């Protein structure tokens, strides 16, 4: 109801993770388990799995466990002191560190075109403050 009425929601750490439709690290016994006994997030971001503290805790490869089992999901890893602000289908990165995007594509600031890689590749890329991403199209916005 809050979002439907134009309100704002937020969350950090596990509070950010639960905003996606898939709950990463939702195990009641151990937060190192990526696909635990609780897998349903709030679904504010549809077909998305969100992880947190990804660089500070060296977790940037953990998302692949989920994506191997649920390849339709978009993986988003948010590092400490960093956030995404979502408006409609677009998110923008704010903060000191990076957001890691797992969409099966390669992207570079140095002018590379977006390229689809074989599904077996464990590929991700980083977005920094000010970068924007279209959740619906699964593309970076320039």
Model-derived regions: residue spans:
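C-terminal and late-domain segments of enzyme folds
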Residues: 23-142
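Catalytic nucleophile loop
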Residues: 2-22
